[in-house]
Regions:
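Negatively charged, low-complexity tracts enriched in Asp/Glu with abundant Ser/Thr
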Residues: 1-3, 7-8
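Short linear interaction motif-like sites in intrinsically disordered regions of transcription factors
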Residues: 3, 42, 95-98
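Terminal substrate-recognition subdomain of acyl/acetyltransferases
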Residues: 10-36, 74-75, 79-176
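Generic marker of "main functional regions" within proteins
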Residues: 50-52, 71, 114
Length: 176
């Protein structure tokens, strides 16, 4: 697990549900979300063009902004049982799922120590499968070639069917 001192980050809430991250006063990433009952919905997470090309290999803006949000919500005392996001078929067309699915699958290792959550990742064919808790069996992430081949096929199937996929983390509290 990583430790974040969020006071070291230049982040701002654009509104109640949009967090923006800056590096040297340059806008680098944005995360939009909503709290819906017992679920935290990630409605948008992206790096700006500058954030994608910034010459700082020690910074992982997508990871950092997601972690900052979790710390912020934890400090506010927000409680949720799951974190849900949609993987748009448009992003699959741009081949983005090849990086976003592995990123979400391994995000647990970047969850800050101070956040009392353990996140268990699951991937779903579509929203109906998610609502029925019918996740897609995933190869182990450490089997990189098998995982990459799985993601490539999963992405192509969704492009052919022109449908979105969903991911979800079951949130387990590990300390109050």
């Amino acid at each position: 697990m990583w430790h974040y001192n969020i006071e070291d980050y230049d982040y701002r809430f654009h509104d109640d549900y949009t967090l923006q991250l800056y590096d040297n006063k340059r806008f680098v990433a944005e995360l939009s979300f909503r709290l819906d009952g017992k679920a935290l919905w990630i409605t948008n997470l992206y790096r700006t063009e500058y954030g994608k090309t910034a010459e700082n290999p020690d910074r992982h803006y997508g990871t950092e902004i997601f972690a900052i949000l979790l710390i912020h919500l934890f400090r506010k005392g927000e409680s949720f049982d799951s974190i849900i996001g949609r993987l748009s078929v448009q992003d699959a067309d741009w081949n983005n799922w090849m990086t976003s699915i592995p990123y979400y699958a391994k995000f647990q290792q970047y969850v800050p120590d101070e956040v009392g959550y353990r996140l268990n990742f699951a991937l779903f064919e579509d929203k109906a499968a998610m609502q029925q808790n019918q996740s897609v069996p995933l190869p182990a992430y450490k089997e990189k070639e098998a995982f990459r081949a799985f993601v490539a096929e999963f992405q192509q199937e969704h492009i052919r069917a022109c449908k979105d996929a969903y991911f979800c983390y079951a949130v387990e509290r590990i300390h109050p």
